[in-house]
Design a protein with these regions (language model features):
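Catalytic binding pocket for nucleotide-activated donors in carbohydrate/polymer assembly enzymes
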Residues: 1, 83-86, 106, 111-193
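Conserved catalytic-core segment of nucleotide-activated headgroup transferases in glycan assembly
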Residues: 2-80
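Short, well-ordered alpha-helix to beta-strand connector turns
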Residues: 15, 61, 103-105, 149
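Short His-Asn-centered micro-motif
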Residues: 21, 66-69, 93, 108-112, ...
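Exposed, low-structure sequence patches enriched in small/polar residues
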Residues: 53-54, 103, 110
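Nucleotide-activated donor-binding/catalytic signature segment of Leloir-type glycosyltransferases, i.e.
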Residues: 76-93
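Short acidic alpha-helix that forms the nucleotide-activated donor recognition element
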Residues: 94-104, 121
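C-terminal alpha-helical cap of glycosyltransferases
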Residues: 190-211
Length: 211
């Protein structure tokens, strides 16, 4: 994973909102070794549908909001998701994710692109659902993701992700996230993969204005 990351400031506002971000996926980009777009896209969406099905009737589902990408595709994401769980709540697709991240208590990223780096850049508690073969990642990324799995950040199955969410429901998320061994790995990961933009204020304002 690699991205140009704005130096985002964490907002003082907090809520119980958990945001699950669905990324635009037309095929794999630089961090994936092979172009297996269609098969991997189907696997990605199938596992999200499983996760949403598992949420039905769960208390934690009351706090979860889905953020779709504003660019539509032939996959009809929203229709598929609602067919598995008609109670899902969605955020405004046109609103910038940057504006949403800082006010949430937890972010669920579903793809190892720029989105997860933006969450980590402000040290926002973040879980990642990564259902693909780790061998598709380059060696350096794979080493980190294996560590993230052990630390409870990355989850390979919808069932594992739900179990972690239910565990954190009864814990102080900030305390869990800021555990020293977790923060040490995250710090090294950000140093390796996040390129922070020195003109942070000007660039961030452009992004917000164009969102």
């Amino acid at each position: 994973p690699l991205g140009i990351i704005k130096n985002l400031n964490s907002s003082s506002k907090r809520s119980n909102k958990i945001i699950l971000e669905v990324r635009k996926r037309t095929g794999y980009i630089g961090e994936i070794k092979i172009d297996s777009g269609f098969i991997e896209n189907k696997k990605y969406l199938d596992n999200l549908c499983i996760f949403f099905s598992l949420l039905k009737g769960k208390k934690i589902s009351e706090d979860i909001f889905v953020k779709l990408h504003q660019t539509k595709s032939f996959w009809n994401d929203k229709k598929q998701f609602l067919s598995h769980n008609s109670e899902l709540k969605f955020l405004d697709e046109k609103k910038s994710m940057i504006k949403e991240i800082s006010s949430a208590k937890l972010i669920i990223q579903t793809f190892c692109g720029t989105g997860h780096l933006e969450s980590l850049a402000i040290n926002k508690p973040t879980l990642i659902l990564f259902v693909h073969d780790l061998n598709l990642l380059n060696n350096r990324s794979k080493i980190y993701f294996k560590k993230f799995i052990k630390l409870g950040i990355v989850h390979k199955t919808p069932e594992s992700l739900l179990k972690m969410l239910e565990t954190l429901e009864n814990q102080n998320i900030e305390k869990w996230w800021n555990l020293k061994k977790r923060q040490n790995v995250l710090k090294k990961y950000k140093e390796d993969f996040c390129i922070f933009n020195k003109e942070k204020i000007k660039d961030l304002q452009k992004i917000i204005n164009n969102a």
